[in-house]
Amino acid sequence: MGSNGLNGVKDTNGANGAHANGASLSRSLKPGIYAPIPSFFVPQTEDLDLESFASHVVRLAKANIHPLISGSMGEAIHLTHAERKTLIQTARRALDEAGFTDVPIIAGTGTGSTRETIELCHEAAEAGADYTIVIASGYFAGALNPKALKTFFTEVAEKSPIPVIIYNFPAASGGIDLDSDLITGLAEQCPNLCGVKLTCGNVGKLTRICATVSESSFATQHPRKNPNAPFLVLGGFADFILPSTYVNAHGAIIGLGNVAPHATARLFELSQATLQDPSLLPEAQRLQGIVARGDFTIAKTSIAGTKFLLEKLYGYGGVPRTPLPPIEAEAAAALWAHPHVQELVRVERELSGKLTA
């Protein structure tokens, strides 16, 4: 996932040293595709299924997809502090043992209060995370005006021992939808912020933020605290990876990366390549269409649908932790049979070299 200067982001992977918490400075945050990893559970007991989790993290790394642990897809709201730390430690160990020592880990640290969010940031760093991603709590959404939200993200960024990504996801935060002025203002004022994930799906907002952070003056006037953590603008859905490339976005953090890692990684690579070779645009457009249709269809079934597809494709996945229900049998059958899903599966198998059903 090396950036090679993509969209104005310098690749600083050659840096040496480590944070006091053990997070290596050489694990740069680079443009590309990241996947929010599901948390897998043992049937009946609902204990963490660490074996499946570790295997999945490595499977994605082999496809050049990097992990986000304990995010929305990872059912972070259902996890204890200790479980969050265990997942980070398990992922780091699995990646290192598989030879992916340079793959960074992003950890979700969103929760209720500012105090606990900061506490989770410290725990994530201690467990081996390189970066955190933070969502505003939606419990008191009606009372959190722009000033309160700015104060929240500023304080978390200042007190987190590792760089922080802003997570804008209105559906998971009581309708809180950060606008581009607030996000760019935070980016300018908080050197420990290293990006934003826009699961609002607002391409206009993404374009405006990219216009600010891609200016050459931004990096010089607002340098990051960690030189390996430039401010990345990342989409939250797979259906606008190609269009976002043309406004200087840096990739995406997408649930579809779990189901179709090769297809989504290839789409990002192709999208970047079209900037230098426009003859590749028709191929990129074709793949973007397949990915967009598949993403839209699968997203309707949420976490349970993604876990069902993982079970169907790879033999692990299971069901969500209660009270989140599993996908109904009829809905699961319809999802698997859907032509958009079957088309995506076919492309994924072709790109991964697995041609058998």
Model-identified regions with their sequence ranges:
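Active-site beta->alpha loop and helix N-cap motifs at the rims of alpha/beta catalytic domains
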Residues: G2-N7, N16-G175, S352
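Catalytic alpha/beta core domains of metabolic enzymes, predominantly
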Residues: E155-K159, P163, P170-K300
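A broad structural signal for alpha-helix termini and local helix breaks/kinks
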Residues: L95, S160, C190, L310-Y314
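General structural feature for long, well-ordered alpha-helical segments within catalytic domains
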Residues: D49-S52, H56, E83, L87, ...
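Structured C-terminal cap/extension of enzyme domains
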Residues: G2-N7, N13, L242-A357
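Repeat-unit-sized solenoid/scaffold elements
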Residues: I135-F152, K197-T212, A332-Q342
